[in-house]
A protein has these predicted regions:
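Pyridoxal 5′-phosphate
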Residues: 1-227
Length: 227
């Protein structure tokens, strides 16, 4: 849940002629991101988290729209059907085959929802909920937390924890039986877990949203307290 100093990292990369790609999966839709001011060259994010879209859709934003990236998948695009080569121009260059139209439409609705509610309002509400959850879990003797209480502007509304004597997957299965959805494991960030010393089993990650109710967090805290 800790926000890294992207601006400083981007400046360091550019100093040595390197470009920087930022995975904004946990921050897109929650905290403001200005690609021009931050120095981000490539920004990618999932659509099903803070942007409230469905799974199976994501976004890639290029700081320089003329930047020609290599492709992983190539195929028909419907725009240059006579050519046997992948188009050079975006976005067709990166959208081979039949695109996920339902996902794009749903993601657009999610982005519109975020824009209407306002990122500042979303961040304030979600971070308040995450802080409440962190305080509740911190009172439980067997719970280990890996960050300080989430505070602006250094955190996103995510709380990672473990329960002493239990694997993260065991905690997740237990909570799942109580209709509480969390994510367990390495969260696609093995290097971060190496830093935390949790690379063997990962952690339990609880993420809040604008739809999270305090009573739901109380249910999570209460369930963990029984372990």
């Amino acid at each position: 849940g800790i926000r890294v100093p992207v601006e400083r990292l981007a400046a360091l990369c550019h100093q040595y002629g390197a470009k920087i790609c930022v995975d904004a999966a946990q921050s897109a839709g929650v905290v403001p991101i200005n690609i021009g001011e931050s120095g981000i060259d490539y920004l990618c994010c999932a659509g099903h988290k803070g942007l409230y879209g469905p799974m199976g859709i994501g976004i890639l934003v290029l700081r320089d729209p003329l930047d020609r990236l290599g492709t992983i998948i190539e195929g028909g695009t419907g725009t240059q059907s006579r050519s046997l080569m992948q188009p050079d121009d975006p976005p067709e260059r990166y959208e081979a085959g039949t695109i996920n139209v339902p996902g794009i439409i749903a993601l657009r609705s999610g982005v519109a929802f975020v824009a209407k509610k306002g990122q500042e309002n979303i961040y304030r509400e979600e971070l308040g909920m995450a802080s409440y959850l962190h305080r509740g879990l911190s009172r439980l003797r067997r719970v280990k937390l890996y960050t300080n209480e989430p505070r602006a502007p250094w955190y996103v509304p995510v709380v990672s924890f473990n329960v002493e004597g239990m694997k993260s997957e065991e905690v997740g299965e237990y909570l799942g039986r109580k209709n509480i959805a969390v994510r367990c494991g390495l969260h696609c960030a093995p290097c971060a877990h190496m830093k935390l010393g949790t690379e063997e089993g990962g952690t339990v990650r609880a993420s809040v949203s604008v739809f999270t109710k305090r009573r739901e967090l109380d249910a999570l805290i209460s369930a963990v307290s029984r372990l």
